[in-house]
From Swiss-Prot:
Classification via HAMAP family: RNApol_bact_RpoB
Pfam families listed in its UniProt record: RNA_pol_Rpb2_1, RNA_pol_Rpb2_2, RNA_pol_Rpb2_3, RNA_pol_Rpb2_45, RNA_pol_Rpb2_6, RNA_pol_Rpb2_7
Biological processes per GO annotation: DNA-templated transcription
Record function comment: DNA-dependent RNA polymerase catalyzes the transcription of DNA into RNA using the four ribonucleoside triphosphates as substrates.
Name of the protein described by the UniProt record: DNA-directed RNA polymerase subunit beta
GO MF terms held by the record: DNA binding; DNA-directed RNA polymerase activity; ribonucleoside binding
Protein species of origin: Christiangramia forsetii (strain DSM 17595 / CGMCC 1.15422 / KT0803)
UniProt family annotation: Belongs to the RNA polymerase beta chain family.
Oligomer and partners: The RNAP catalytic core consists of 2 alpha, 1 beta, 1 beta' and 1 omega subunit. When a sigma factor is associated with the core the holoenzyme is formed, which can initiate transcription.
Amino acid sequence: MLAKQTERLSFSSVKNKPAYPDFLDLQIKSFQDFFQLETKSEERGNEGLYNTFLENFPITDTRNQFVLEFLDYFVDPPRYSIQECIERGLTYSVPLKARLKLYCTDPEHEDFETIVQDVYLGTIPYMTPSGTFCINGAERVVVSQLHRSPGVFFGQSFHANGTKLYSARVIPFKGSWIEFATDINSVMYAYIDRKKKLPVTTLFRAIGFERDKDILEIFDLAEEVKVSKTGLKKYLGRKLAARVLNTWYEDFVDEDTGEVVSIERNEIVLDRDTELEKDHIEEILETGSKTILLHKEDNQTGDYAIIHNTLQKDPTNSEKEAVEHIYRQLRNAEPPDEETARGIIDKLFFSDQRYSLGEVGRYRMNKKLGLDVEMDKQVLTKLDIITIVKYLIELINSKAEIDDIDHLSNRRVRTVGEQLSQQFGVGLARMARTIRERMNVRDNEVFTPIDLINAKTLSSVINSFFGTNQLSQFMDQTNPLAEITHKRRLSALGPGGLSRERAGFEVRDVHYTHYGRLCPIETPEGPNIGLISSLSVYAKVNGMGFIETPYRSVTDGKINTSEEPIYLSAEEEEGKKIAQANIPLKDDGTIDTDRVIARMEGDFPVVDPKEIHYTDVAPNQISSISASLIPFLEHDDANRALMGSNMMRQAVPLLRTDSPIVGTGLERQVATDSRVLINAEGEGEVEYVDANKIVIKYDRTEEERMVSFDDDSKSYNLIKFRKTNQGSCINLKPIISVGDRVTKGQVLCQGYATEAGELALGRNMKVAFMPWKGYNFEDAIVISEKVVRDDIFTSIHIDEYSLEVRDTKLGNEELTNDIPNVSEEATKDLDEHGMIRVGAEVKPGDILIGKITPKGESDPTPEEKLLRAIFGDKAGDVKDASLKASPSLSGVVINKKLFARAIKDKRKRAQDKEDVAALEKKYDAKFANLKADLVEKLFTIIGGKTAQGVQNDLGEEVMPKGKKYTLKMLNAVDDYTHLTTGTWTTDDHLNELVADLLHNYKIKENDLQGNLRREKFTVSVGDELPSGILKLAKVYIAKKRKLKVGDKMAGRHGNKGIVARIVRQEDMPFLEDGTPVDIVLNPLGVPSRMNIGQIYETVLGWAGQKNGKKYATPIFDGATIEEINDLTDKAGIPRYGHTYLYDGGTGMRFDQRATVGVIYMLKLGHMIDDKMHARSIGPYSLITQQPLGGKAQFGGQRFGEMEVWALEAYGASATLREILTVKSDDVIGRAKTYEAIVKGEPMPEPGLPESFNVLMHELKGLGLDIKLEE
């Protein structure tokens, strides 16, 4: 028998929808590309961690004598499993090692041998299979960042007087920014790093266009004329384009060195734009100039007036002057010599050490400027600078367009891998610095790579990134949808991004390039709106970091359905006409209408089908996962849909899950891709099932058995009552029985907001839209008592309480149930370690973990010490430091854990040695058996065949070519993990089998090594705990929360409300057949909010309940009103759900029909139990002595200024005085009042409020002496 799966009837009309990409690809693929562990080192691309190493190595010392070269890196298996890390508060990480080679290039040190070593570089947090990182026991997600792409951007702004100013900004991947901008006088300046400005022509001179002539030639602006008396006469009246200079050299003696130095001097004879007159000819001849430059006579030069204006402002005349001018601008000092001055520009923009556009920047630059510079040339070139200035001039003359900064071709995604690369870059650069220093210090001593490297450098950078970076976030784990959405989130905030305060409306707005890439609906409400968005369902991030979305290509009005969809980035999509996914088609895929509404950039032209380039692949391609889960989204207002998508992420997993009757067809994919459930790995039969584990016997061929080291049966452990980050509960239960046949990918369990392999965030409820005695006024909700009684909205929440035992200066703390001055009743549930027993019911104030800590007191006298020793009075020197239940905590203890560090004494050390030896012996036997197994299997496959020369990693031949394989020969090989899998025999099929066998052997051997390492560590070190902590005790308390008045509920359409009344079932309105409704919603919540989708859902849900069917109505492609009417008619229920209801109290029929049906409701994480709070006495603020505020601080209710006015208005002076003094900050008064209440005496007079004293001290701080007089 096959296990059950929910079948959904789909209303979709669009055929050929492609499969969704894996929803976690954004995280997992990015991380895999970063580490490239599956790839052999010689095949690794120049990306990720490998590239970061190559950028920082080789490292040489200052004299270039020693070189440290990087060869390869690898990681060892993690020490703990993910679950162990979560329980012990550890980081799930892998040890990173690099193979480094140290050699000497100096012939004097010929005795120095080349050393190759594997060096430990620290432990690096490793991604779990579900795309998260476990850091210090908490699951975290690194959110991808959406930032400005490197490249060149052209923009415009307006001066106060209305003049348009244009600018071009070059944003590099690393290095200084350079900006070219115009000012109101039509002069073009270059700004370096946004602060220092210089005329563009100065920059031109500095990069090699030394003379005016060279600069004017770039733009073809001048005519060169030979100087001769007669020749110049015909040019009289024309204007000079460049200065006429008189140049000479002066010699002077440098006083410091005594050298003779010659200096070039320039004198301006005629300035630019001087009209050539007769008198000038003589002056020009005297200078000895061979040629002069004149303005061209054609009218084309008007466009380039800005260059002439800039030359006028340019104070320099030669390359030397230009570089010195730039040096002075940037350094605010005179250049020491010409070379230093020249070096500054080279270093800033032309050195690949300091400056890089990155691959993306070069690509964008070439695209924008129409250049063809090689992709690996990642510094600025002269051509880049010239082309940018030319483009800017075109912009000024309205011959080019400015860039749209919010266009997705100008924004790119920095995924986890890239962010980690950057952090590794920082860490390795620091490490390189220390290595260089150590190399320089160790001159002639013999040293090895290990001596040079400090492993802490790298891991401290990486750990601070995961711990404190704004983009490394505590995972939202309320339900599977919240997890998956958090991993697919894109944030414009964070280092190198925007800040909330500075972001304007344009950045936050929906842009036409978001179509199919970023969801226009799902974004937070509040200050982050539009800055944090979600990736659309089909979107992918390409190698450059740009978001792509799939389309089907169209040729001559016919869609190519047979081909795979084509992924296009925003830039590639420009200028293309794209049709909707649901256009009518003929059977052969030809568009079946005369005119088509298409999308082209931000426009919607109506065009001929032959003009269409592409069509969308699916109607829901525009939205993210959350929005695609809202049925009938097309009938909802976008603002409400936004609330709906956000609230689905806050839905608490319920005790009894139930998938929606009206879904959208995406529910299964979300549940699968969230990696919460267990799926069958192939065809097979269920052998054993209980609440904790499932065992499946898989069908395998003889060959599969041959290359595997595992049994046919595989057992899966189910997660039971695991606490999530948000305190909700993951508890999986099997949905298959012994003897069932399972297929590959089939879901074996349910729970944690899933049912039968589908996402199930809430429950289907019988609903009536009608007012009920005013109790559902303003979005309040009326609920039937049956909902509470049947545990329909009951959820389990787990709290973790922990207590650390530290060693203090006065002695060690201790866990115990023997606590001073505490009754036996209070400690009855504690074990000998002071931990509460599993199953105990906890009430506020109960002791959860008993702990005593030494009390700091004056040293006892010798007599006291003696008496204490005799009578054992220990209570005097310890105080109670137990963990007690907080005021709102009640529940049942479901688990407890105690972790302890191993205590080392001589006997224990000896015992440890024995235990480790026994362990090693046990594992040696396991390794031997595994190898014997391998040899036997290998012999079965290739025994008697001729060897083709098998080599190991180092290229040494292990099995000689031409010999036949024998058992002896196979047994003689020491290490099978380092053999090349390749040509063992001449038969390719056998070679593949051997490769698979060796691969599986490596995995198995690795697992055993990991287990051995872990067990050894546990024996010798005990539990790994942070320093200074001897023991860590944890208690888990579960609370079963039923639905209560004050809990927040919501539908999927942004229809949220608070439970206002729980009504007896017999008092609820009922249908004609006597069925009472479960929930009554206010009809006034629908029309003004314009989320009519909930009404469609209600009606279709009722039809589904009656017909016993579940439906999928994909967004923008869902059920029409006609289809719903057909189903309601078939089910025998009234159209539109319009039904007469009867009053539960009187049995009378209500006058008007109401809409009745089945709606899917969620219980949200905002529960009254977490919010309700009361205080009589509690903690006070240190300075003002007023009560603290908030539930977390066990605070009081603030009685503010306006409340004081209210009491003043009533003339309630005594109440007011009491509130402002003894109930607040009159310290002496409140103590006396408490005493008076206890003793039953009359209330004393209030004293002076502490806040008055604070004011007095403030005034004294200002130097005013204030005396109080009676």
